[in-house]
Amino acid sequence: MPKYYCDYCDTYLTHDSPSVRKTHCTGRKHRDNVKFYYQKWMEEQAQHLIDATTAAFKAGKITNNPFAGGPSSAPPKPSGVSIPPPNMGAPPRPGMPGMPFMPPMMNPMMTGMRPPPIMNPMAMMGPPPPLGTIPGVRPPIMNGPK
């Protein structure tokens, strides 16, 4: 009878049957070995990425950090167009949208008031569409006039 070999645990099971494999795979040692295997694999992938990035930088393939915000990464400014800085703390100019109305902050003196209930987003959506339907497409009318 063939034996089942577990690559993570580096061991043979007594025999190849679903119940033995299930028992083995739910065991603590097997789960720890699987976790260790993938942690090691992720560390190797991260190190490979670091090495490849370092080699590309040394070879001159990476010339500038795209997140640095230097002059080469910024889009060119159109000539003649100037956007004034925002007014910090000043009232908005006429025609500019202001801040939306914000309710006053609750303080400990407002003990008789309760916060508004939080709506469940799923409750506002309604029931899900039947399986096999395409979102946004109306289903055909089955019992319509003939």
From Swiss-Prot:
A zinc finger (Matrin-type) spans 4-36. It is found in: Nucleus. Disulfide bonds: none annotated. Its main location: nucleus. It holds the Pfam family zf-U1. GO terms for molecular function: mRNA binding; pre-mRNA 5'-splice site binding; U1 snRNA binding; zinc ion binding. Signal peptide: none annotated. GO terms for biological process: mRNA 5'-splice site recognition; spliceosomal snRNP assembly. Keywords: Metal-binding, Nucleus, Ribonucleoprotein, RNA-binding, Zinc, Zinc-finger. The keyword Metal-binding applies. Coiled coil: none annotated. Gene3D superfamilies: Classic Zinc Finger (3.30.160.60). Component of the spliceosomal U1 snRNP, which is essential for recognition of the pre-mRNA 5' splice-site and the subsequent assembly of the spliceosome. U1-C is directly involved in initial 5' splice-site recognition for both constitutive and regulated alternative splicing. The interaction with the 5' splice-site seems to precede base-pairing between the pre-mRNA and the U1 snRNA. Stimulates commitment or early (E) complex formation by stabilizing the base pairing of the 5' end of the U1 snRNA and the 5' splice-site region. Belongs to the U1 small nuclear ribonucleoprotein C family. HAMAP family: U1_C. This is U1 small nuclear ribonucleoprotein C.
